Amino acid sequence: MIKKIAFVLLVAFMTAGAVHAKPKKRVVYMFGVSASFTDSIAYITDVQRMDPVYIESKTGFLYDRSIYSQQLQTFMEEKMGRPHTTCTIFFSKKKRKLESKYLKVIKFHKKRNSLNIRQMETGAFKFVPEEWTEHETI
């Protein structure tokens, strides 16, 4: 009897790991940084509210993060005339936490004199929420 219960529990634990967590629609806050390895100027967007975006329920990761950095990169190429930039996004569910990170990024680069950070005008660039589609995993 104990062997049967142990077997059932073992099978339950093994299949639980194979099930993917469903994404949750959440409000998050986000900003982006665009920098080039060949230039000393980097651009930083304002902190923006994103509603809704999809968050991985187990890890808290933002689905399709690369799409948002691609949006910023496309903007930098087409509107700002700055090709070949590397774009990074930062996000948080809490606005205060992200604003703190925003200030740390600016302070870090000013302190090191590594990049001249230029803040984009409010509303110059807007992230567009992406519709989540389930990706097939192998």
Placement of each model-derived feature along the sequence:
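N-terminal start-of-chain detector that recognizes signal peptides
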Residues: 2-4, 60-63, 90
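A short linear-motif detector with a strong N-terminal bias
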Residues: 11-12, 67-70, 95-97, 106
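Tryptophan-paired
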Residues: 62-78, 83
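Intrinsically disordered, low-complexity boundary segments flanking structured domains
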Residues: 18-21, 73-78, 104-105
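Bacterial Sec-dependent N-terminal signal peptides
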Residues: 1-23
